[in-house]
Amino acid sequence: LHLGGKVINVNSQESSVQKGETFNDTLKTMEAYCDGLIIRSPNNEILSDYQNNIDIKMINGGDKFEHPTQALLDLFTIRQELGTVNNLKIAIVGDLYHSRTIISLVKMLLNYNVALYFVFEEENKMDLPIYLQKYLIEIKEKSYNTNHIIEYHYEYDLDKVIPIVDVIYMTRSQKERHMPNNDNLLHKNKLIRL
């Protein structure tokens, strides 16, 4: 907005989608009004499904599995406060399994030389989703023949990690994303707290 931009906020309840217009037609209409779109949707495939149908940029403002705009702000804050992201030791703590921001932040952090410490309570089984664990392994294997250093650790005791990290990234329990009758809810009072 400081650069002269203007925002057009379109709520799905206020759009012509309610009258039967296709989402693709809505995007085509928006394309005529603006230079870019930030889309927040519970559909995690919406950008990949439609990005080739319009000639303006689309930014993921949050979907079912990721929240890259929040992760960009978090990355910006780390850099703003510490002057760099490279060579930092970063603890990522809490409900790792259900957090959308963690997935996006980890993917961004893997572009830097960082050591990541994933801290979660073992009995809660809230560690990283399997696909993110596989992604970490894949990226680490690709970096073996480069100067890109990727280091990550799993830890159950935050007290062990606090003295050695530069950043502690805390997430809350994502109880709205838990399945009903999930054992994790039984442990909500035992989640890691600072």
Summary of predicted features, one role per range:
Residues 20, 75, 147-155, 189-191:
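Short gly/ser/thr-rich secondary-structure transition/capping motifs
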Residues 56, 113-114, 194:
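A short helix->loop->beta-strand "cap" motif at the edges of active sites that frequently abuts
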Residues 172-193:
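Glycine/threonine-rich flexible loop motifs
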Residues 1-79:
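Phosphate/diphosphate ligand-binding glycine-rich loop within oxidoreductases
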Residues 49-52, 103-106, 180-183:
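Short amphipathic alpha-helical segments
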Residues 1, 80-171:
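Glycine-rich phosphate/diphosphate-binding loop of Rossmann-like nucleotide-binding domains
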Residues 41, 171-172:
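Glycine-rich, N-terminal phosphate-binding loop of Rossmann-like dinucleotide-binding domains
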